[in-house]
Amino acid sequence: MCSRSVALRWGAETLATAGIEQARREARQLLAYALGITPEALVRDPEAELALGEYQGLVHRRAGREPLAHIVGRRGFWTLDLAVSPSALIPRPESETLIEAALQAFPDRTQVRTVLDLGTGTGCLLLAALTEFGGAFGVGVDLASEAAAVAAANARQCGLHGRCAFIAADWAESIEGGFDLVLSNPPYIPSGEIAGLAPEVALHDPLAALNGGTDGLTAYRRLLPNLPSLLNPGGVAIFEL
């Protein structure tokens, strides 16, 4: 047994030694997760005692470079709290720029009635877009049926399941046109560079969500020719690069 403050200090030191950049913040998140409380609640009683067992296991997993999101099973994106899975790319903060770009493209949010998300993963882009374009219906497509299932579960959790559908398909091959907004974060890492990525990415994100082929542009060559048939007149496509 030890106090929360001692456990937190040990966790932060262990993660820092393992090369985790935000060691104290992540140690705090793991301790809160182990206790079933919020990180903010930790400060209310820092000297409360706890058994280290579960927390030690979580810290060692993170020190082994397993992503924090996989350990706690969740990741925030835009205004949403989403479930994550090894079958889908962990949502990145930088992908929120696609939602920002969509809002700039359509200052009148009633203009967007249909949204397509190609390579939906957790559904983060589509679900975030639906929270902003309140009258829209969305379709999310992913090659991995497991990822499509995660996205559908996130839609239910967010109360958006009545406004979207998720399907497992090879990009847009089974999709007919008629979309005002097309979003996509396709794989764009050149094949030869994947091994040099952070272990959290190279070893834990699905390879299909990373591998952009020899030059990183394979998916774009597949997708771009389909855009004219997918977009409504005045429609906009926004891709992460």
Predicted stretch roles:
Residues 1-50, 54-55:
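A short N-terminal interaction module
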Residues 8, 27-28, 55-56, 65-68, ...:
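A general structural signal for well-ordered alpha-helical segments in protein cores
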Residues 30, 155, 185, 201, ...:
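Conserved RecA-like P-loop NTPase ATPase core
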Residues 31-104:
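Conserved AdoMet
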Residues 94-196:
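Conserved SAM/SAH cofactor-binding pocket of Class I
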Residues 102, 129, 201, 223-227:
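Class I S-adenosylmethionine-dependent transferase superfamily signal
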Residues 214-241:
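Conserved Class I SAM-dependent methyltransferase catalytic core
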